[in-house]
Amino acid sequence: MAAVKCKPTSPGRRHVVKVVNPELHKGKPFAPLLEKNSKSGGRNNNGRITTRHIGGGHKQAYRIVDFKRNKDGIPAVVERLEYDPNRSANIALVLYKDGERRYILAPKGLKAGDQIQSGVDAAIKPGNTLPMRNIPVGSTVHNVEMKPGKGGQLARSAGTYVQIVARDGAYVTLRLRSGEMRKVEADCRATLGEVGNAEHMLRVLGKAGAARWRGVRPTVRGTAMNPVDHPHGGGEGRNFGKHPVTPWGVQTKGKKTRSNKRTDKFIVRRRSK
């Protein structure tokens, strides 16, 4: 896998950096694990915009990814690695010994032909999934559950991982990439290793059109709007002189947004960035 800078054959190609992975499958995805994925355009069921800057983009099929990894005791072989347009990480198509196929997140170093397994008896190697009470302290893991049996929710993006720093009875303490340290039940599952495709962060789209292909619409500055459209709008010239806020008047810098007090007790240390 490598980051390749394109030749400047046009203004739109001049700054493009692509991530090339020759190990990815070049054919079609596995059809039984595909679902229709309708675009919302950022609108809710009333047709009102609830998330700005979303719309258009190429049609995509959703790949049904197994985040629970609950097929215990049955070994599986990695058939191939695939691109997934719905996430930054690549996915792997695995064939279980009983004939079932599933998609999983592709960890760093996983390749076609490798064997993986889930359950308490699985070996300690990248790609295997175990309850965190059975994983050595100090290990890096990904696809981490926050409730037993719910499926992985933490560390699913390309290049991410979580480190197990302590185990205390029914809980393990995790260090997240943000710097936050939090407790999770020791029976929650996690997959060993870090998510692959870490070079994703080196990608440069190079032109506005590449963002539009991905369904991302332009972001207009508040100072460029009229007073009716934004609190920063209006004025002669480029005067600002206010605390920056959202279009609805909520502070944008430093305002706390977390409201889930029920789980505050599990956070040992707040995030540092």
From Swiss-Prot:
Signal peptide: none annotated. Residues 28-53, 221-273 are annotated as: Disordered. It comes from the Bacteria. Keywords: Acetylation, Ribonucleoprotein, Ribosomal protein, RNA-binding, rRNA-binding. SUPFAM superfamilies: Nucleic acid-binding proteins (SSF50249), Translation proteins SH3-like domain (SSF50104). The modification N6-acetyllysine is found at K242. GO terms for molecular function: rRNA binding; structural constituent of ribosome; transferase activity. GO terms for biological process: cytoplasmic translation. It holds the Pfam family Ribosomal_L2_C. SMART domains: Ribosomal_L2 (SM01383), Ribosomal_L2_C (SM01382). Residues 39-48 have a biased composition (Low complexity). GO terms for cellular component: cytosol; large ribosomal subunit. One of the primary rRNA binding proteins. Required for association of the 30S and 50S subunits to form the 70S ribosome, for tRNA binding and peptide bond formation. It has been suggested to have peptidyltransferase activity; this is somewhat controversial. Makes several contacts with the 16S rRNA in the 70S ribosome. Part of the 50S ribosomal subunit. Forms a bridge to the 30S subunit in the 70S ribosome. NCBIfam families: rplB_bact. Belongs to the universal ribosomal protein uL2 family. This is Large ribosomal subunit protein uL2. It comes from Shigella dysenteriae serotype 1 (strain Sd197). The gene is rplB.
